[in-house]
Structures are given as C-alpha cells and as structure tokens.
C-alpha cells in the first residue's frame, strides 16, 4: 500500500469561541412602548483561514436586525468561531467542510448567544430557525460555476 492511500480523513474540533459580539438598541426605551410587530432580518456570512498545516479557523457571522417600521428596534451581531483540525481531504470536500459542515457546528452556539443578548435587552424571545448551510453552500457553488463570482454571503 502506498503512503498516499494510507492518509485517512480526520476531523476534530479544537476550540469553539465567541470572537466578537455586539448588541444595540438605539431607540430604547421608547421602543418598549410600541406594539411589538417587528420585521426581523437575518444575515449570515462565513469566512475561513488556515492557521497551520491541517488546522483552520472558521468564523460564522450572524447579524439579526429587528425593525419597527423604519426604526431599528435592535441590532445584534455575533461572530462565532471555531478552530478545526481537518486532514485527508482537499479541494471541494475541504471547501464544503469549512463552508457548510463547520458553520453547522457553530450556528447553535451563535443562536444561543443571540437569544441571550436579545433577552438581556428585555425584548421578546427570539427563536432563530435552523439554517441549512449545505444548501447555502451548494447555491454558492452554483453561482461560482455560473460566473457570478459572488462572495459566500447569504441572506436568510
């Protein structure tokens, strides 16, 4: 058996951490006196960088904006990050791992952080639905193959 064939696929989470966090309620306390019928916008973005041989940082940026009419009730942004060891894969498989699999791991942490921040701002509970990062990644690949060249930024 050759050495190339003996390379096994391996994946390990080394660390998950909150890299950046922000919560703003620019119209507080007046916003608390209004009827709560917000328009909620969810923005997602992912980025990855190689830290060492077979070690990558993946950052999932989640921004939630709640608006009442033209006014922003709150704006919450979390950058949830992870350091992952990924061995034995490359090319499209590696891109999928860093662009979909790792964000799937990070999203529940970001969602919990956002829910906590919104609650601490004394706004009604915010439940973010699960995100299908596999589908978003496939859409990104399709856009790339069609020559759009868009950055891997998704609005949900």
Swiss-Prot record:
One of its GO terms (molecular function) is unfolded protein binding. The keyword S-adenosyl-L-methionine does not apply. InterPro entries: SecB, SecB-like_sf. Gene3D superfamilies: SecB-like. Keywords: Chaperone, Cytoplasm, Protein transport, Translocation, Transport. One of its GO terms (biological process) is protein folding. Homotetramer, a dimer of dimers. One homotetramer interacts with 1 SecA dimer. HAMAP family: SecB. Belongs to the SecB family. One of the proteins required for the normal export of preproteins out of the cell cytoplasm. It is a molecular chaperone that binds to a subset of precursor proteins, maintaining them in a translocation-competent state. It also specifically binds to its receptor SecA. This is Protein-export protein SecB. It comes from Serratia proteamaculans (strain 568). The lineage of its organism: Bacteria, Pseudomonadati, Pseudomonadota, Gammaproteobacteria, Enterobacterales. The gene is secB.
């Amino acid at each position: 058996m050759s050495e190339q064939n003996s390379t096994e696929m391996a994946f390990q989470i080394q660390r998950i951490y909150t890299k950046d966090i922000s919560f703003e309620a620019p119209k507080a306390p007046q916003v608390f006196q209004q009827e709560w019928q917000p328009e909620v916008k969810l923005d997602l973005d992912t980025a990855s960088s190689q830290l060492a041989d077979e070690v990558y940082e993946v950052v999932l940026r989640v921004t939630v904006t709640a608006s009442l009419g033209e006014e922003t009730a709150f704006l919450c942004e979390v950058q949830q990050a992870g350091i992952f060891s990924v061995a034995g894969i490359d090319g499209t498989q590696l891109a999928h791992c860093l662009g979909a699999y790792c964000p799937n791991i990070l999203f529940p942490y970001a969602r919990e952080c956002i829910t906590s921040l919104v609650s601490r701002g004394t706004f009604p509970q915010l439940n973010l639905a699960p995100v299908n990062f596999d589908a978003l990644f496939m859409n990104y690949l399709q856009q790339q193959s069609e020559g759009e060249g868009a950055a891997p930024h998704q609005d949900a």
